[in-house]
Amino acid sequence: MTIQCKVKSIQPLACNTYQILLHPESPVPFKAGQYLMVVMGEKDKRPFSIASSPCRHEGELELHIGAAEHNAYALEVVEAMQAALETDGHIEIDAPHGDAWVQEESERPLLLIAGGTGFSYVRSILDHCVAQNKTNPIYLYWGARDNCQLYAKEELVEIADKFANVHFVPVVEEAPADWQGKVGNVLQAVSEDFESLENYDIYIAGRFEMAGAAREQFTQNKKAKSERMFADAYAFI
């Protein structure tokens, strides 16, 4: 479904990463974990995970877009959003999309794994589960190059402190001397912490290679069930 949206705000979150709030002309029914397509042209639609959960923000849609200078694909979208904001114009989106939404009926513990701005996908799921007062154990592993890119770290620490069933583990490749989290690869960190993933619902967002490696490693080495692993990437790989 194609919908016109006003761009409500654009805020920098971290190095080259922006939070964008969209206000659609009509409500967009979506499930936590789905994505939208920003329509840049008739045959040019670009996918971004919806970072907000369906039960919040009074119909607003939140995006987190990583737009480094070398990433023209995302940078052009941010520039189009900026132009719409400055001229009080519209952005066109096509939504909702994706089959990797949260399995609300499941009572299994959740393992949420994000690489970089893949965090927006797991944030929607976490936010939704917390808002719905779900009591399933939730483990969120967020990997990034450095601490600067973990732009929601303080928010996640607060959520984990407030809700006994939520556990947050930050993972960076380059750690400062006073670093309190894990160092290295996010999939390696998960492998070190879990003997078995047999009983988990696993949600993954990041590069396609990471999602593919997770499916291979976790099903072969950690007894994960491939049918209980969810990622947008799995529709393509």
Swiss-Prot record:
Alphabetized PROSITE patterns for the sequence: FAD_FR
UniProt xrefs under InterPro entries: FAD-bd_FR_type (IPR017927), FNR_nucleotide-bd (IPR039261), MRET (IPR050415), OxRdtase_FAD/NAD-bd (IPR001433), Riboflavin_synthase-like_b-brl (IPR017938)
One annotated GO molecular function: oxidoreductase activity
Keywords assigned by UniProt, alphabetized: FAD, Flavoprotein, Luminescence, Oxidoreductase
A Pfam family: NAD_binding_1
Signal peptide from the UniProt entry: none
Keyword Plastid set for record: no
Family: Belongs to the Fre/LuxG FAD/NAD(P) flavoprotein oxidoreductase family.
Primary role: Involved in bioluminescence. It is a good supplier of reduced flavin mononucleotide (FMNH2) to the bioluminescence reaction. Preferably uses riboflavin as an electron acceptor when NADPH is used as an electron donor.
Protein name: NAD(P)H-flavin reductase
Organism field: Vibrio harveyi (Beneckea harveyi)
Gene name, Swiss-Prot/TrEMBL: fre
